[in-house]
């Protein structure tokens, strides 16, 4: 590849923010965009009827509830770097969409509420990052409130997330006594000023912690800081970039996102530490971002980003080569060449037509139903990028249509919403009632709302006695025999794959035992 392409690749950073609900993820997203010049004014994020909602929460239901229920993609420039930020759903139900977003990024920012410490959703999401050895930077948020001791927070990560921590900044006090942070490597003391435009008061570079100026500025709190830093020098892990890039160590920063404090130091370090676009695995070989031929994959489909146009956008991660507007690419699953005329880049709901894009960039392609999650596009080579799964649903509902004349609109709505991958749709081999499955319960409320709001279809959901599903594969004759014998519990999913529904774990185990010639899969990689 030309050197010019290497420069383009190396200045890109593609990352997602993960956290437990209410840890301040959407607030920090807003503040990062503020520093990147992408927005002029950050909108505090909470459920309220205000004229201004958080930039990344654009769907109608999100605006009403003040939660992020879809993953937005935002692009901005900072210090010469092109940053692609993927905002993941903040409610603890939205795991599946989030899991897939994590397949499209090269690193992750983990936001932890310093009052509550590590919470369940953070744990779940970290497991997904660990599977992929994703590098993680940690931001301890809400230092302007009384929370847990900083050393206890580090201990919490090490014990609960089984990950080594390396503090980079250290807080001076907390809550009402919060004075700022001390950078353990640059020896800068950054003062917190709630009245300042971005929360940052003056920045003081000191000769060391024995500088008498500190006693003057911090009073008795300086003893606390000296004691903490002395402890850290003996007990804390020094930052090790290689361990961070291998997903084994997380550098830790402290601050208060709502006051924009500590966010700039975090962003500066992120640019320095986080990896540029990484090589990607396919079923046949590893693709380097520096290769000349173009390639990439779809990790998300979003219907009705613009309800006025009833459109569907496929979110696409570029893995190698250069994208140019109007280029022809091979859609490998369908085995045909397609022209990508109007690709877009995103700023939440705002879109701009893209003339060119590079590895690490996320572009949107208009989708008329032919693109599915996991689809690979190349300049001719038969590749398939791996690791974009569907998870077996844990919750199920039967869909009852309130107006029988709307059955076609219902089918269209269910299939389009299922294409986004947040819910799965199942049609029984016997009977006519659709069943939808989700990894989290809130998805049912989202589907009901969106069917009514976007497709003018009113439905009721009824409970069904299923607790899990498995995708079934095997020799054709055996599969046909299975379909006959288990017809009451066999469904076809939105991808046309055979699915077995089980009413209990015992029933599932028993069925697997009885049909040893067949394979029962807990995840279905998008084909």
Swiss-Prot record:
Single GO cellular component term: cytosol
Statement: the UniProt record of this protein carries the keyword Transmembrane helix: no
Keywords: Cytoplasm, GTP-binding, Nucleotide-binding, Protein biosynthesis
Cell compartment(s), UniProt: Cytoplasm
A GO BP entry: regulation of translational termination
Protein family (similarity comment): Belongs to the TRAFAC class translation factor GTPase superfamily. Classic translation factor GTPase family. PrfC subfamily.
Protein name listed in UniProt: Peptide chain release factor 3
Molecular function as annotated in GO: GTP binding; GTPase activity; translation release factor activity, codon nonspecific; translation release factor activity, codon specific
Source species of the chain: Pelobacter propionicus (strain DSM 2379 / NBRC 103807 / OttBd1)
Binding site for GTP: 19-26, 87-91, 141-144
Cited Pfam families: EF-G_D2 (PF22042), GTP_EFTU (PF00009), RF3_C (PF16658)
Function of the protein: Increases the formation of ribosomal termination complexes and stimulates activities of RF-1 and RF-2. It binds guanine nucleotides and has strong preference for UGA stop codons. It may interact directly with the ribosome. The stimulation of RF-1 and RF-2 is significantly reduced by GTP and GDP, but not by GMP.
InterPro entries hit by this protein: EF-G-like_DII (IPR053905), EFG_III/V (IPR035647), G_TR_CS (IPR031157), P-loop_NTPase (IPR027417), PrfC (IPR004548), RF3_C (IPR032090), RF3_dom_3_sf (IPR038467), RF3_GTP-bd (IPR041732)
Record SUPFAM superfamilies: EF-G C-terminal domain-like (SSF54980), P-loop containing nucleoside triphosphate hydrolases (SSF52540), Translation proteins (SSF50447)
Residue ranges of domain tr-type G in the record: 10-278
């Amino acid at each position: 590849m030309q050197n010019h392409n290497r420069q383009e690749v190396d200045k890109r950073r593609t990352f997602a923010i993960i956290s437990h609900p209410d840890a301040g993820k959407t607030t920090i997203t807003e503040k990062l965009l503020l520093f990147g010049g992408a927005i002029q004014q950050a909108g505090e994020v909470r459920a309220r009827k205000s004229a201004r909602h958080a930039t990344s929460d654009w769907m109608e239901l999100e605006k009403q509830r003040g939660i992020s229920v879809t993953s937005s993609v935002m692009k901005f420039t900072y210090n010469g770097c092109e940053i692609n930020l993927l905002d993941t759903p903040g409610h603890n139900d939205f795991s599946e969409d989030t899991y897939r977003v994590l397949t499209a990024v090269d690193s992750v920012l983990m936001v932890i509420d310093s009052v509550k410490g590590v919470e369940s959703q953070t744990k779940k999401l970290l497991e997904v990052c660990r599977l992929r050895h994703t590098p993680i930077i940690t931001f301890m948020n809400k230092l302007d409130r009384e929370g847990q001791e900083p050393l206890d927070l580090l201990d919490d990560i090490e014990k609960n997330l089984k990950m080594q921590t390396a503090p980079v900044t250290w807080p001076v006090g907390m809550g009402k006594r919060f004075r700022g942070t001390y950078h353990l490597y640059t020896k800068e003391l950054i003062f917190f000023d709630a009245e300042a435009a971005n929360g940052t008061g003056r920045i003081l570079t000191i000769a060391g912690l024995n500088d008498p100026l500190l006693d003057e500025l911090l009073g008795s709190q300086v003893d606390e800081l000296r004691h903490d830093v002395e402890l850290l020098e003996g007990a804390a892990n020094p930052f090790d970039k290689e361990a961070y890039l291998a997903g084994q160590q997380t550098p830790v920063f402290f601050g208060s996102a709502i006051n924009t404090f500590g966010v700039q130091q975090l962003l500066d370090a992120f640019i320095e530490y986080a990896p540029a676009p990484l090589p990607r695995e396919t079923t046949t070989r590893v693709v380097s971002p520096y290769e000349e031929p173009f390639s990439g994959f779809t990790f998300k489909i979003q219907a009705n980003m613009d309800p006025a146009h009833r459109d569907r956008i496929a979110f696409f991660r570029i893995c190698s080569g250069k994208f140019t507007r109007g280029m022809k690419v091979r859609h490998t699953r369908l085995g045909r060449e397609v022209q990508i005329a109007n690709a877009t880049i995103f700023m939440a709901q705002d879109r701009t037509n893209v003339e060119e894009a590079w590895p690490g960039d996320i572009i949107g392609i208009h989708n008329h139903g032919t693109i599915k999650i996991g689809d690979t596009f190349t300049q001719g080579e038969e590749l398939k990028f791996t690791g974009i799964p569907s998870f077996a649903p844990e919750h199920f509902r039967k869909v009852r249509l309130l107006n029988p004349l709307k059955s076609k609109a219902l089918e269209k709505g269910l299939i389009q919403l299922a294409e986004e991958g947040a819910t799965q749709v199942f049609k029984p081999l016997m009977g006519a009632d659709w069943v939808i499955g989700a990894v989290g319960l809130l998805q049912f409320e989202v589907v009901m709302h969106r069917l009514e709001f976007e497709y003018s279809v009113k439905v009721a959901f009824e409970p069904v006695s299923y607790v899990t599903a498995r995708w079934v594969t095997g020799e054709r004759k055996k599969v046909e025999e299975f379909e006959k014998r288990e017809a009451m519990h066999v469904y076809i999913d939105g991808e046309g794959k055979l699915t077995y529904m089980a009413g209990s774990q015992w029933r599932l185990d028993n069925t697997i035992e009885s049909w040893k010639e067949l394979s029962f899969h807990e995840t279905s990689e998008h084909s």
